[in-house]
Amino acid sequence: MSNAGESGVKPAGENRPLGAPRGKRPRIRVSCVDQLGACRCHHGHKSGDVFDFDRDRGKMCAMACHVGFPYIDILRYGGTVPGNEPGTAKFCCPEVDTLNVWLAEIVDE
């Protein structure tokens, strides 16, 4: 089903993307805030590590990035994650022996 009128042309404004305009997305800071498991992180992360998601994500464990990405996208495009303060999202890495807890938050510039 299409939103196009009978002429096949969409009304003005309907072609705009939803969410924040490209280049205007907020910066996201990702911090390791806790470790629940007994073993050291295989990537070397520890509580207190802080990363700028856009600049430093190559320095972060790929598993933590993979888990955090949906939450970061939610924050970037104006959504909220249930059970978290607005502008923040907590998630855990999937390594069962480590279980680092990460906090993603919007950085006001």
PLM features per residue range, with description:
Residues G5-P26:
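Short, Gly/Pro- and small/polar-rich lid/capping loops
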Residues P26-G37:
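Short, structured beta-strand/loop micro-motifs enriched in basic residues and often containing a Trp
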Residues Q35, R55-C61:
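Short, charged beta-turn/beta-strand-edge "cap" motif at the junction between a beta-strand
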Residues A62-G79:
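Short, compositionally biased
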Residues G78-E109:
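Short, compact, well-ordered microdomains
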